[in-house]
Amino acid sequence: MSLTNEQIIEAIASKTVTEIVELIAAMEEKFGVSAAAAVAAAPAAGGAAAAEEKTEFDVVLKSAGANKVAVIKAVRGATGLGLKEAKDLVESAPANLKEGVSKEEAEALKKELEEAGAEVEVK
């Protein structure tokens, strides 16, 4: 008797995480492959899209640096967050401050935060 894809999916869905990890390890051993290799190869397929000009950028706070108070003030001004929310965001670095902004806005925000003492990355 051959199992359908639906039956296989249902069988896997009923397993615990530990059982699934053991299943993956057994499949890797039986077929001589690694799940990590398949995951690493996947981004290569999207390489053509990355060659296009990027129009939207994300501003990521990597660390607050030595002057955390100034960075919190800068984050509040840039995002419109309240004091507690801005403090929580700064303390949870690395964290996305803004997503999908123009290059000019991203660079301006990066400059403002770096002047306050933060380490910032534009992606």
UniProtKB/Swiss-Prot annotation:
Gene Ontology BP term (one): translation
Assembly information from the UniProt record: Homodimer. Part of the ribosomal stalk of the 50S ribosomal subunit. Forms a multimeric L10(L12)X complex, where L10 forms an elongated spine to which 2 to 4 L12 dimers bind in a sequential fashion. Binds GTP-bound translation factors.
Organism ancestry: Bacteria, Pseudomonadati, Pseudomonadota, Gammaproteobacteria, Pasteurellales
Family statement: Belongs to the bacterial ribosomal protein bL12 family.
Gene Ontology MF annotations: mRNA binding; structural constituent of ribosome
Annotated Gene Ontology cellular component terms: cytosolic large ribosomal subunit
Protein source organism: Haemophilus influenzae (strain ATCC 51907 / DSM 11121 / KW20 / Rd)
Protein task: Forms part of the ribosomal stalk which helps the ribosome interact with GTP-bound translation factors. Is thus essential for accurate translation.
Descriptive protein name: Large ribosomal subunit protein bL12
The entry's keywords: Ribonucleoprotein, Ribosomal protein
